[in-house]
């Protein structure tokens, strides 16, 4: 009841508080009256609520009573009805004599036709709750509307679609049909057995009981495996020439049928990871088998390590049996369907395919080959997948020729394409591309090559495709196998650990097995990494997939990693575990471990002339193999199957490439870190071999290179992956220019791996082949540039090979251990070489390759120091690479290179970019550089970019060391002028290059200038060279920035090792180092050239680019400008080069350059701080030494110098940042160049009017660079301001930024960035903002006026309401209270009033 709830409350609390609150508290009477009134009102309210509640309750009770009464009346009526009806029912029941119907009838039939309602007691058929749901539901489908269209008339449709009898009828008919089928099947089989016996059965061996037993087994088998008769295929019986139950071997049928294992005589060719059904297309309709499940040998690969030759014996299909090797080895595999076939061993052909092998372009399927000898077709034997196994076994035993068993016995799978059979057609259709045991990844765990026999299932029809009945020569497309066998492990190379094999997994398994390459090349069906989705062998030429002789089917594994099963590898009988995993090409090496990396080289060189894609791939593979192999290498003639000895020197480059490729293969599979191990093994040979690619060899490679590029492209959709790996190896393994063929952006991606990634874009560079091809292209480019690339390259590379071979080997091993993607893990020098100096490592090869691609620069920058100068002349990238390489080498070598001061090298550099580069390659620094690289390589902590920078550093530092000791300024000037000239020449030559002209120009200018400045920078900064080694390119940039090393040494920044790495300035600035990745491989090299040329810095490089060589030199002005570019250009060049590539047409606007410089200037506060102290001194000294003549350019250069000095102090941090952003310290360098550019632009445009245009044009390039540099540049604002102070007073403002240098570089960078943007935006936006502001102000004023007008009313109203309302209410209440009191008082009014008043 409500009262209970309200009792706890004050009675008057229920009433309006105004009733008593208004009373005067000082007047007790008034207060009491108010409280009394409130209490009464509350009580009345409670009573009213209670009355309402009671009314509702009684109403509900009334309704319930009425409902109960109604139901009771209904019950009474029903009871009465029952009483009336029951007697009749009772009578009927009692009258029945047989009560059995009660137990059998369905319920109402026994009633005497008396229909009663279901619910006798309740009124409805269903409970109300259920009826409600029915009422709410929709009605039945209005099928009656269709009755007019039905012949049966009204209600037919509803009945037809709701009658369950229809379903029952269908089921019964189905069962009947099933029974009929079973009966027919049994009778047919019995007849067939009898006919076979009649046709020549030998009763002594095969008894009638055997036939009966077989029939029973078969029936049970079918019943067990086929519950659905509709799926059972009825086969037509045909008479065979021999006893069906007795095979020629003399064993009874039951013997074989009961055996769980089959003798070596019986083997099954195909195993698919996908146990999908194979449809055989046979000419004869009677032979057609609709569905034939293939035998799945998926497990074999994994367990194949142990066996000799693994052959799958065929037990009954229903049981998954460990296949017994023909040789006694066993492979545990599930045999889902075992089409029996003989293997025709084709020596030297690797038909092997991993689970990834795809037939007819269909992954996971191997075409099955029917017996080609006595068995015209096994199709008749297949009733079903399960039935097929059994019947096939039976027929195999019965009809299988001895020769088939014999072929299997020898342990080699031989597929006989005997024409004896009528059904020759069928075998081709079913020809298998490989047998697991024979696959390079053999089921035994040994490559088929190791077995000496390549089981190449060769049938008259080479077509792998099931449907394709054409000749085997035809690859029905690359049959990429989606599934990958674990047999890759089987393919484990002797050099590769099982893990590596596993790692190589599908990609490696993908190795394309071409039995005989059309070119007779190494069966390098696929590159180490054929990551492209399409199989390498899509084009017969493109891959060795096309098997010339027995290559009826070259089963290519998925493009991930087509592995080359050397046709010859098997023929030698060597147990070569193809580097199925980490190196597809490695498989060749693994196979011929004795074949050094040169094998691939041989393929490319010897076979290269063929220019077949196979060659390219073979070359690539050979490279991988070569890497795995020892220095001596042999080329395997695919056709002859003989190994061709090849000079180590000839294949040094190739072997390195191969090594690189092997690394690429191992690295190409990102998952395949184990490949590192493989690669490491492969690499050693390359260490011995300096990846020396003679011009001839490169030319050969180049010849096939074009074809290779195409084929590789086809072959490698994911070339980048493969290429990347190759590049890494190439760079590391040798001064291989392989990587450069690809686009620069590839290099950026692959930079961590190596420039080789670029090959992927170019596609001309396959893996190992890519290296060769790239080298070839590089040589051509070098020649184009007028360089003696071949001789220099060969000699330089050889020297490098000799000098740096330990480093290469180290790098290669490191790479192999690290995995392709772990290039960062590689020795810093090597790694640096690989990503940025990949071509650099390649020495001249790389440079040569650079012609083909901007990354030729990377190729150019060789690990060998001597190579570097040589490279610089090869192409724009060559010279730049040379400088860059030296620069990087300096960075990488760090102290080591600095220790190696070779004036000769510097002089060479000064001589001319071409001369210097060629000489430099062969200069003393090679050994030291190698050492430096090796010593530097221990700096894997640096980003790959850093490593690249470091790698380049060593080369660069060679120059630095040499140049620093020798005339610093003079050499710098010489180098600058020569580099400028070369840059101009390179610009011209590269303008026509496929690479963007501007991009090339920038890189050329960078390279040329960089080369000069490199020597200059080297000259000035022995210390900075050391610093640079520590922080790749940054220190060197600082040194070149400063006029002379003498002054710079004071401000030598601590070694990067000593300094904590700073985050990339780009990060601080918030810019993405987009250009870095692309140019890491090239850009770093470019950076080295950038260092030598001042393009990134601004007008120096710009002038060089835009101006003739002489003008460029003038614009550079003095050694300072030269050095400054050397230091700055390296960083700027990396980024600017990328930038230039990215922004081919950049306005040479001084403002934009200024902005770019300014932005980079802001990034490093530390630089600013150091800059403040050292910058002024250094700049002053620098300005003093470097002539005021070039003060505009020089000052801009000086500015970066000062920044560099700051960076020297902050170099390590800066280097880390730049290395993280770039692969090297490009950020630092970029920053340096950027600021330099900024200052230079201003100074250059002001002081060098003659070079203004040139500077402008170069600024255009530089700006292209600058966007990157800006993002990457980490120059502190103070640094930038210093430069303006020296060069021009435009940047006087920067000192202000320097003041806040305590702030983080990020803040400065943001401030500078914002400031620059604000300037632009402020000019454009201010007027509109003002107008908008005015509009807003006017609107606001109007609104305010309106609101002010409205406010008074609002305020007045509330004030008025409060007082009077209360008074009125109180008065009214009092009046009412008085009235009530008066009424209650009645006759006692007077007394009451007295009492009230008294109280």
Swiss-Prot record:
GO molecular function terms attached to this record: actin binding
Gene3D superfamilies hit by this protein: 1.20.5.340, 6.10.280.150
Looking at the UniProt record for this protein, which Gene Ontology cellular component terms does it annotate, in alphabetical order?
A: cytoplasm; cytoskeleton; SCAR complex
WH2 domain location is 1335-1353
Q: Does the keyword Cytoplasm apply?
A: yes
Bias-annotated ranges (Polar residues): 430-456, 507-542, 1102-1118, 1251-1261
User: Biased composition, Low complexity: where in the chain?
Assistant: 597-608
> In which tissues or organs does this protein occur?
Expressed in expanding cotyledons, expanding leaves and expanding siliques containing developing embryos. Lower expression, sometimes not detected, in unopened flower buds and in matures leaves.
Q: List the residue ranges of the region (Disordered).
A: 178-205, 371-456, 502-542, 568-611, 896-961, 1102-1139, 1207-1261
State if Cytoplasm is listed as a keyword.
yes
List the keywords (alphabetical).
Actin-binding, Cytoplasm, Cytoskeleton
- Which residue intervals are annotated with compositional bias (Basic and acidic residues) in the record? 398-426, 568-580, 942-953, 1207-1227
Question: PANTHER family, per this entry?
Answer: WASP-1 (PTHR12902), WISKOTT-ALDRICH SYNDROME PROTEIN FAMILY MEMBER (PTHR12902:SF1)
According to its UniProt entry, the function of this protein is described as: Involved in regulation of actin and microtubule organization. Part of a WAVE complex that activates the Arp2/3 complex. Regulates trichome branch positioning and expansion.
Record remark: domains: Activates the Arp2/3 complex and binds actin through the C-terminal VCA (verprolin homology/cofilin homology/acidic) domain consisting of a WH2 domain followed by an Arp2/3-binding acidic motif (A), separated by a conserved linker region (C). Binds BRK1 through the N-terminal Scar homology domain (SHD).
Sequence similarity: Belongs to the SCAR/WAVE family.
The protein depicted here goes by the name Protein SCAR2
Q: Which organism is it from?
A: Arabidopsis thaliana (Mouse-ear cress)
Q: What is the lineage of its organism?
A: Eukaryota, Viridiplantae, Streptophyta, Embryophyta, Tracheophyta
Name the gene behind this protein. SCAR2
